[in-house]
Design a protein with these regions (language model features):
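N-terminal accessory segments
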Residues: 1-15, 37-42, 47, 284-306, ...
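N-terminal flexible segment immediately upstream of the FAD-binding catalytic core
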Residues: 1-39, 44-77, 127, 200-203, ...
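C-terminal substrate-recognition/cap domain of FAD-linked oxidoreductases
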Residues: 2, 187-189, 195, 201-391, ...
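Glycine-rich tight-turn/loop motif centered on a GG-T
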Residues: 17-21, 77, 330-332, 375-386, ...
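A glycine- and small-aliphatic-rich helix-loop capping segment at beta-alpha/alpha-beta transitions
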Residues: 54-69, 94-98, 120-131, 201-205, ...
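FAD-binding subdomain of flavoenzyme oxidoreductases
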Residues: 70-74, 82, 86-87, 91-235
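Activity-critical C-terminal alpha-helical subdomain
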Residues: 414-434
Length: 434
Protein backbone atom coordinates (compact mmCIF):
# COMPACT_ATOMS: atom_id res chain seq x y z
CA UNK A 1 0.00 0.00 0.00
CA UNK A 2 1.27 3.51 -0.77
CA UNK A 3 0.36 6.79 0.88
CA UNK A 4 0.51 10.35 -0.36
CA UNK A 5 2.61 12.94 1.37
CA UNK A 6 -0.30 14.23 3.45
CA UNK A 7 -1.36 10.99 5.17
CA UNK A 8 0.00 7.76 6.59
CA UNK A 9 -1.30 4.28 7.41
CA UNK A 10 -3.25 5.64 10.39
CA UNK A 11 -5.68 7.27 7.96
CA UNK A 12 -5.02 10.72 9.39
CA UNK A 13 -4.94 13.38 6.66
CA UNK A 14 -3.16 16.71 6.85
CA UNK A 15 -2.10 19.70 4.79
CA UNK A 16 1.17 21.46 4.04
CA UNK A 17 2.18 24.89 2.80
CA UNK A 18 5.15 23.38 0.99
CA UNK A 19 6.38 19.88 0.13
CA UNK A 20 10.14 19.40 -0.26
CA UNK A 21 11.88 16.33 -1.66
CA UNK A 22 15.61 17.07 -1.28
CA UNK A 23 17.98 14.92 -3.33
CA UNK A 24 20.99 15.36 -1.05
CA UNK A 25 22.25 16.88 2.19
CA UNK A 26 22.98 20.28 0.64
CA UNK A 27 19.41 20.69 -0.57
CA UNK A 28 18.01 19.51 2.76
CA UNK A 29 20.20 21.91 4.75
CA UNK A 30 19.15 24.80 2.50
CA UNK A 31 15.48 23.93 2.99
CA UNK A 32 15.89 23.72 6.77
CA UNK A 33 17.62 27.10 6.82
CA UNK A 34 14.85 28.68 4.74
CA UNK A 35 12.13 27.13 6.90
CA UNK A 36 13.90 28.35 10.03
CA UNK A 37 14.16 31.86 8.58
CA UNK A 38 10.43 31.88 7.93
CA UNK A 39 9.69 30.24 11.30
CA UNK A 40 7.82 27.54 9.41
CA UNK A 41 7.22 24.27 11.27
CA UNK A 42 8.83 21.25 9.59
CA UNK A 43 7.41 17.71 9.43
CA UNK A 44 9.69 14.86 8.34
CA UNK A 45 8.13 12.21 6.08
CA UNK A 46 9.28 8.62 5.91
CA UNK A 47 7.54 5.82 4.05
CA UNK A 48 4.06 6.50 5.42
CA UNK A 49 3.60 3.15 7.16
CA UNK A 50 3.29 4.74 10.60
CA UNK A 51 0.12 4.39 12.66
CA UNK A 52 0.25 7.57 14.74
CA UNK A 53 0.22 10.40 12.19
CA UNK A 54 3.82 11.32 12.96
CA UNK A 55 4.66 12.17 9.35
CA UNK A 56 1.35 13.93 8.62
CA UNK A 57 1.79 17.73 8.46
CA UNK A 58 -0.79 20.10 9.88
CA UNK A 59 0.55 23.13 8.04
CA UNK A 60 4.13 24.27 7.57
CA UNK A 61 6.67 22.42 5.45
CA UNK A 62 6.95 18.71 4.79
CA UNK A 63 10.39 17.24 3.98
CA UNK A 64 10.37 13.77 2.42
CA UNK A 65 13.46 11.58 2.88
CA UNK A 66 12.70 9.30 -0.08
CA UNK A 67 15.79 10.35 -2.07
CA UNK A 68 18.29 9.38 0.63
CA UNK A 69 19.02 5.98 -0.86
CA UNK A 70 22.53 4.96 0.17
CA UNK A 71 22.95 1.24 0.87
CA UNK A 72 26.45 -0.17 1.45
CA UNK A 73 27.06 -3.50 3.15
CA UNK A 74 30.19 -4.94 4.73
CA UNK A 75 30.86 -7.80 7.10
CA UNK A 76 28.83 -7.18 10.23
CA UNK A 77 27.50 -3.77 9.27
CA UNK A 78 25.46 -1.77 6.77
CA UNK A 79 25.37 1.92 5.94
CA UNK A 80 21.83 2.93 5.05
CA UNK A 81 20.17 6.13 3.94
CA UNK A 82 16.97 7.24 5.64
CA UNK A 83 14.94 6.41 2.51
CA UNK A 84 16.02 2.77 2.24
CA UNK A 85 13.17 0.42 3.16
CA UNK A 86 13.48 -2.30 5.73
CA UNK A 87 12.71 -4.81 2.95
CA UNK A 88 15.64 -3.56 0.88
CA UNK A 89 18.05 -3.88 3.80
CA UNK A 90 16.81 -7.38 4.65
CA UNK A 91 17.15 -8.50 1.01
CA UNK A 92 20.64 -7.06 0.58
CA UNK A 93 21.89 -8.51 3.86
CA UNK A 94 20.50 -11.95 2.99
CA UNK A 95 22.61 -12.11 -0.19
CA UNK A 96 25.73 -11.83 1.96
CA UNK A 97 24.59 -14.41 4.52
CA UNK A 98 23.71 -11.78 7.10
CA UNK A 99 20.59 -10.27 8.63
CA UNK A 100 19.45 -7.13 10.42
CA UNK A 101 17.83 -8.25 13.71
CA UNK A 102 15.02 -5.67 14.16
CA UNK A 103 12.02 -6.72 12.07
CA UNK A 104 9.02 -4.38 12.29
CA UNK A 105 6.03 -6.03 10.64
CA UNK A 106 5.74 -3.41 7.89
CA UNK A 107 8.83 -4.04 5.75
CA UNK A 108 8.13 -1.05 3.48
CA UNK A 109 8.91 1.27 6.39
CA UNK A 110 11.84 3.62 5.75
CA UNK A 111 14.93 2.99 7.88
CA UNK A 112 14.82 6.62 8.98
CA UNK A 113 11.32 6.08 10.33
CA UNK A 114 12.24 2.88 12.18
CA UNK A 115 15.12 4.73 13.86
CA UNK A 116 12.90 7.71 14.71
CA UNK A 117 10.41 5.39 16.45
CA UNK A 118 12.93 2.88 17.86
CA UNK A 119 10.88 0.17 16.15
CA UNK A 120 11.18 -3.46 17.14
CA UNK A 121 8.91 -6.19 15.73
CA UNK A 122 8.48 -9.87 16.44
CA UNK A 123 12.18 -10.75 16.79
CA UNK A 124 12.52 -8.23 19.61
CA UNK A 125 11.87 -11.21 21.89
CA UNK A 126 15.55 -12.12 21.37
CA UNK A 127 17.18 -9.06 19.86
CA UNK A 128 15.48 -6.03 21.37
CA UNK A 129 14.61 -2.80 19.55
CA UNK A 130 16.36 -0.69 16.91
CA UNK A 131 18.42 1.46 19.30
CA UNK A 132 20.53 -1.54 20.30
CA UNK A 133 21.72 -2.10 16.69
CA UNK A 134 22.83 1.40 15.69
CA UNK A 135 26.54 2.24 15.66
CA UNK A 136 26.52 5.61 13.91
CA UNK A 137 24.04 8.31 12.93
CA UNK A 138 24.27 11.28 10.61
CA UNK A 139 21.66 13.83 11.70
CA UNK A 140 20.58 17.26 10.46
CA UNK A 141 19.59 19.60 13.28
CA UNK A 142 16.75 22.11 12.78
CA UNK A 143 19.40 24.83 12.36
CA UNK A 144 20.85 22.95 9.38
CA UNK A 145 23.96 21.85 11.27
CA UNK A 146 25.03 18.26 10.51
CA UNK A 147 26.09 15.95 13.33
CA UNK A 148 27.96 12.70 12.70
CA UNK A 149 27.87 10.69 15.92
CA UNK A 150 29.15 7.25 16.84
CA UNK A 151 28.15 4.80 19.54
CA UNK A 152 29.73 5.96 22.79
CA UNK A 153 30.14 9.62 21.81
CA UNK A 154 29.38 11.49 25.01
CA UNK A 155 26.64 14.12 25.10
CA UNK A 156 28.18 17.53 25.80
CA UNK A 157 25.62 18.75 28.34
CA UNK A 158 24.36 17.53 31.70
CA UNK A 159 21.66 14.92 31.24
CA UNK A 160 19.12 14.46 34.05
CA UNK A 161 17.70 11.06 34.92
CA UNK A 162 14.07 10.41 34.05
CA UNK A 163 12.41 7.33 35.61
CA UNK A 164 11.66 4.71 32.96
CA UNK A 165 8.89 2.08 33.01
CA UNK A 166 9.57 -1.54 33.91
CA UNK A 167 8.26 -2.78 30.55
CA UNK A 168 10.78 -4.36 28.16
CA UNK A 169 9.80 -2.09 25.26
CA UNK A 170 9.52 1.68 25.52
CA UNK A 171 9.61 4.50 22.96
CA UNK A 172 7.94 7.48 24.58
CA UNK A 173 9.68 10.81 25.07
CA UNK A 174 13.44 10.98 25.59
CA UNK A 175 15.00 8.21 27.75
CA UNK A 176 17.18 10.68 29.63
CA UNK A 177 19.85 9.29 31.94
CA UNK A 178 23.40 10.30 32.86
CA UNK A 179 25.96 8.55 30.65
CA UNK A 180 23.68 8.13 27.63
CA UNK A 181 25.21 8.87 24.24
CA UNK A 182 23.96 10.79 21.20
CA UNK A 183 22.64 7.67 19.51
CA UNK A 184 20.54 6.84 22.57
CA UNK A 185 19.09 10.35 22.42
CA UNK A 186 18.29 10.63 18.70
CA UNK A 187 16.91 7.09 18.34
CA UNK A 188 13.24 7.08 19.29
CA UNK A 189 12.98 10.88 19.35
CA UNK A 190 10.55 10.80 16.37
CA UNK A 191 12.48 13.48 14.49
CA UNK A 192 11.83 16.12 17.16
CA UNK A 193 15.56 16.69 17.79
CA UNK A 194 16.86 16.29 14.25
CA UNK A 195 16.42 14.48 10.94
CA UNK A 196 18.18 11.14 10.51
CA UNK A 197 20.02 11.24 7.18
CA UNK A 198 21.80 7.91 7.33
CA UNK A 199 22.89 5.28 9.81
CA UNK A 200 25.37 2.50 10.28
CA UNK A 201 23.68 -0.56 11.73
CA UNK A 202 25.05 -3.87 12.93
CA UNK A 203 24.32 -7.12 11.08
CA UNK A 204 24.59 -10.70 12.32
CA UNK A 205 25.43 -13.91 10.44
CA UNK A 206 22.31 -15.71 9.24
CA UNK A 207 21.57 -18.74 11.45
CA UNK A 208 22.35 -22.02 9.74
CA UNK A 209 18.82 -23.33 10.27
CA UNK A 210 15.60 -21.96 11.69
CA UNK A 211 12.44 -23.69 12.84
CA UNK A 212 9.21 -21.77 12.36
CA UNK A 213 5.78 -22.67 13.62
CA UNK A 214 2.21 -21.51 14.06
CA UNK A 215 0.81 -23.51 16.94
CA UNK A 216 -2.92 -23.67 17.57
CA UNK A 217 -4.68 -24.14 20.92
CA UNK A 218 -8.16 -25.15 22.11
CA UNK A 219 -8.43 -22.13 24.44
CA UNK A 220 -6.84 -18.81 25.22
CA UNK A 221 -5.85 -19.95 28.70
CA UNK A 222 -3.99 -22.98 27.36
CA UNK A 223 -2.13 -20.74 24.89
CA UNK A 224 -1.08 -18.31 27.63
CA UNK A 225 0.06 -21.19 29.84
CA UNK A 226 2.21 -22.41 26.95
CA UNK A 227 3.58 -18.92 26.39
CA UNK A 228 4.73 -18.74 30.01
CA UNK A 229 6.29 -22.20 29.77
CA UNK A 230 8.10 -21.50 26.49
CA UNK A 231 9.62 -18.11 27.24
CA UNK A 232 12.83 -19.80 28.44
CA UNK A 233 13.27 -22.10 25.41
CA UNK A 234 16.86 -21.80 24.19
CA UNK A 235 17.28 -20.06 20.83
CA UNK A 236 13.70 -18.77 20.64
CA UNK A 237 13.68 -15.58 18.53
CA UNK A 238 9.95 -15.02 18.27
CA UNK A 239 6.95 -15.66 20.51
CA UNK A 240 3.81 -14.04 19.12
CA UNK A 241 0.17 -14.38 20.15
CA UNK A 242 -3.05 -14.44 18.10
CA UNK A 243 -6.49 -14.55 19.74
CA UNK A 244 -9.66 -16.24 18.48
CA UNK A 245 -11.25 -13.15 16.85
CA UNK A 246 -7.99 -12.48 14.98
CA UNK A 247 -7.93 -16.07 13.69
CA UNK A 248 -11.52 -15.75 12.53
CA UNK A 249 -10.72 -12.39 10.93
CA UNK A 250 -8.17 -13.92 8.54
CA UNK A 251 -9.82 -17.34 8.14
CA UNK A 252 -11.06 -16.42 4.67
CA UNK A 253 -7.48 -15.77 3.57
CA UNK A 254 -6.21 -18.81 5.48
CA UNK A 255 -8.96 -21.47 5.40
CA UNK A 256 -6.55 -24.08 6.83
CA UNK A 257 -6.76 -22.43 10.24
CA UNK A 258 -8.46 -25.09 12.41
CA UNK A 259 -12.08 -24.20 13.08
CA UNK A 260 -11.73 -25.36 16.68
CA UNK A 261 -8.63 -23.23 17.36
CA UNK A 262 -9.26 -20.46 19.89
CA UNK A 263 -5.73 -19.01 19.97
CA UNK A 264 -2.32 -19.43 18.37
CA UNK A 265 1.33 -18.77 19.12
CA UNK A 266 3.83 -17.99 16.35
CA UNK A 267 7.38 -19.13 17.09
CA UNK A 268 10.79 -19.00 15.48
CA UNK A 269 13.82 -20.80 16.92
CA UNK A 270 17.47 -21.10 15.96
CA UNK A 271 17.86 -24.85 15.44
CA UNK A 272 20.74 -26.93 16.73
CA UNK A 273 19.53 -30.19 15.20
CA UNK A 274 16.64 -32.64 14.87
CA UNK A 275 16.37 -32.83 18.64
CA UNK A 276 14.78 -29.37 18.55
CA UNK A 277 11.91 -30.75 16.44
CA UNK A 278 11.49 -33.65 18.87
CA UNK A 279 11.41 -31.19 21.75
CA UNK A 280 8.53 -29.28 20.15
CA UNK A 281 6.56 -32.49 19.71
CA UNK A 282 6.92 -33.02 23.45
CA UNK A 283 6.03 -29.41 24.26
CA UNK A 284 2.83 -29.54 22.24
CA UNK A 285 1.75 -32.70 24.03
CA UNK A 286 2.62 -31.30 27.46
CA UNK A 287 0.75 -28.01 26.99
CA UNK A 288 -2.38 -29.30 25.25
CA UNK A 289 -1.73 -27.65 21.88
CA UNK A 290 -3.13 -29.13 18.68
CA UNK A 291 -0.35 -31.54 17.72
CA UNK A 292 -1.70 -32.62 14.33
CA UNK A 293 -3.20 -29.30 13.25
CA UNK A 294 -0.29 -26.96 14.04
CA UNK A 295 2.05 -25.80 11.29
CA UNK A 296 5.85 -26.16 11.28
CA UNK A 297 8.54 -25.60 8.66
CA UNK A 298 12.27 -25.11 8.22
CA UNK A 299 12.54 -23.84 4.63
CA UNK A 300 12.73 -20.25 3.41
CA UNK A 301 9.36 -20.79 1.70
CA UNK A 302 7.78 -21.89 4.99
CA UNK A 303 9.25 -18.91 6.80
CA UNK A 304 7.92 -16.51 4.17
CA UNK A 305 4.49 -18.16 4.32
CA UNK A 306 4.36 -17.70 8.09
CA UNK A 307 5.64 -14.12 7.80
CA UNK A 308 2.80 -13.31 5.42
CA UNK A 309 0.33 -14.87 7.86
CA UNK A 310 1.63 -12.59 10.62
CA UNK A 311 1.58 -9.54 8.33
CA UNK A 312 -1.98 -10.34 7.25
CA UNK A 313 -3.22 -9.66 10.79
CA UNK A 314 -2.61 -5.88 10.97
CA UNK A 315 -3.17 -5.54 7.23
CA UNK A 316 -6.65 -7.10 7.43
CA UNK A 317 -7.54 -5.12 10.55
CA UNK A 318 -6.60 -1.88 8.80
CA UNK A 319 -8.57 -2.87 5.69
CA UNK A 320 -11.69 -3.48 7.80
CA UNK A 321 -11.34 -0.10 9.53
CA UNK A 322 -10.92 1.73 6.23
CA UNK A 323 -13.83 -0.17 4.67
CA UNK A 324 -16.00 0.87 7.62
CA UNK A 325 -14.99 4.49 7.05
CA UNK A 326 -12.65 4.96 10.01
CA UNK A 327 -8.96 5.50 10.68
CA UNK A 328 -6.96 2.80 12.45
CA UNK A 329 -7.54 2.51 16.17
CA UNK A 330 -5.40 0.32 18.38
CA UNK A 331 -2.93 0.04 21.23
CA UNK A 332 0.84 0.11 21.41
CA UNK A 333 1.16 -0.36 25.16
CA UNK A 334 3.78 -2.63 26.72
CA UNK A 335 3.54 -4.08 30.23
CA UNK A 336 5.97 -6.03 32.42
CA UNK A 337 5.79 -9.72 31.49
CA UNK A 338 4.20 -10.74 34.78
CA UNK A 339 1.29 -8.34 34.08
CA UNK A 340 0.42 -9.88 30.69
CA UNK A 341 -2.74 -11.70 31.75
CA UNK A 342 -3.97 -8.91 33.97
CA UNK A 343 -3.73 -6.39 31.14
CA UNK A 344 -5.31 -8.72 28.59
CA UNK A 345 -8.26 -9.22 30.94
CA UNK A 346 -8.55 -5.45 31.42
CA UNK A 347 -8.55 -4.89 27.66
CA UNK A 348 -11.27 -7.48 27.08
CA UNK A 349 -13.49 -6.26 29.91
CA UNK A 350 -13.68 -2.79 28.39
CA UNK A 351 -13.74 -3.86 24.74
CA UNK A 352 -16.60 -6.29 25.35
CA UNK A 353 -18.52 -3.40 26.87
CA UNK A 354 -17.98 -0.77 24.16
CA UNK A 355 -17.31 -2.78 20.99
CA UNK A 356 -18.41 -6.43 21.42
CA UNK A 357 -17.34 -8.60 18.51
CA UNK A 358 -15.53 -5.73 16.80
CA UNK A 359 -11.96 -6.09 18.03
CA UNK A 360 -9.10 -8.57 18.10
CA UNK A 361 -5.80 -8.92 19.96
CA UNK A 362 -2.49 -10.15 18.58
CA UNK A 363 1.19 -9.33 18.74
CA UNK A 364 4.28 -9.47 20.86
CA UNK A 365 2.93 -11.01 24.06
CA UNK A 366 6.34 -12.61 24.60
CA UNK A 367 7.48 -9.04 25.32
CA UNK A 368 4.32 -8.04 27.20
CA UNK A 369 3.25 -6.09 24.13
CA UNK A 370 -0.01 -7.27 22.53
CA UNK A 371 -1.85 -4.96 20.14
CA UNK A 372 -5.59 -4.43 20.61
CA UNK A 373 -6.99 -3.70 17.15
CA UNK A 374 -10.38 -2.01 17.20
CA UNK A 375 -12.74 -2.56 14.28
CA UNK A 376 -15.55 -0.04 14.90
CA UNK A 377 -18.67 -0.43 12.79
CA UNK A 378 -20.33 2.83 13.87
CA UNK A 379 -19.28 6.35 14.81
CA UNK A 380 -20.40 5.67 18.38
CA UNK A 381 -18.05 2.68 18.58
CA UNK A 382 -15.19 4.70 17.11
CA UNK A 383 -15.71 7.50 19.63
CA UNK A 384 -15.90 5.03 22.52
CA UNK A 385 -12.74 3.32 21.28
CA UNK A 386 -10.88 6.64 21.09
CA UNK A 387 -11.90 7.43 24.67
CA UNK A 388 -11.02 4.02 26.10
CA UNK A 389 -7.43 4.32 24.85
CA UNK A 390 -6.83 6.86 27.60
CA UNK A 391 -8.31 4.44 30.15
CA UNK A 392 -5.95 1.75 28.87
CA UNK A 393 -2.97 4.12 29.01
CA UNK A 394 -3.61 5.03 32.64
CA UNK A 395 -3.99 1.39 33.64
CA UNK A 396 -0.79 0.44 31.82
CA UNK A 397 1.24 3.11 33.59
CA UNK A 398 -0.10 1.91 36.94
CA UNK A 399 1.27 -1.53 36.05
CA UNK A 400 4.72 -0.15 35.20
CA UNK A 401 4.06 -0.07 31.48
CA UNK A 402 4.92 2.08 28.47
CA UNK A 403 2.23 3.98 26.56
CA UNK A 404 4.34 3.78 23.37
CA UNK A 405 6.29 0.58 22.86
CA UNK A 406 7.33 0.79 19.20
CA UNK A 407 5.05 3.01 17.10
CA UNK A 408 5.99 6.31 18.72
CA UNK A 409 3.49 8.92 19.88
CA UNK A 410 3.12 10.95 16.70
CA UNK A 411 0.22 13.38 16.67
CA UNK A 412 -2.50 10.89 17.53
CA UNK A 413 -0.98 9.68 20.82
CA UNK A 414 0.90 12.76 22.03
CA UNK A 415 -1.82 13.10 24.68
CA UNK A 416 -0.36 10.03 26.40
CA UNK A 417 2.98 11.70 27.22
CA UNK A 418 1.66 13.43 30.40
CA UNK A 419 0.13 10.10 31.46
CA UNK A 420 3.54 8.41 31.20
CA UNK A 421 5.51 11.28 32.75
CA UNK A 422 4.76 14.01 35.26
CA UNK A 423 5.39 17.68 34.46
CA UNK A 424 8.58 17.58 36.50
CA UNK A 425 9.91 14.93 34.10
CA UNK A 426 8.58 16.49 30.89
CA UNK A 427 10.25 19.85 31.56
CA UNK A 428 13.82 18.43 31.26
CA UNK A 429 12.82 16.88 27.91
CA UNK A 430 11.63 20.28 26.71
CA UNK A 431 14.93 21.78 27.87
CA UNK A 432 16.88 19.23 25.82
CA UNK A 433 14.80 20.04 22.74
CA UNK A 434 15.41 23.77 23.18
Amino acid sequence: MSWGYLEDASGIKGHADRICVPKNESELVAELAEASGQQAPVTVAGGGSGLTGGRVPFGGWLISMEKFRRLDLDSGKARVGAGITLHELHAAAKIGGQFYPPDPTETMAFMGGTIACNSSGSRSFMYGATRRWIERLRVALPSGEILDVHRGDAIDFDVPEIPQPAARKHSCGYPLRPGMDWIDLFTGAEGTLGIVLEAEVRLLPTPRELLNGIIFFPSDEVALDALDAWRSVTGLRMLEYVDDPALRMIAQRYPDVPETAKAALIIEQIMEGDRDIDAWVDRLAETGAFEEKSWFGTSDADRERFRKFRHALPETALDISVRNGFTSLGTDFSVPIEKNREMLAFYRKHMDRIMPGHYCIFGHVGDGHPHVNMLPATQAEFDAGSDVLTVFARQCVQLGASVAAEHGLGKRKAKFLPIQYSTVHIEPMKAVKR
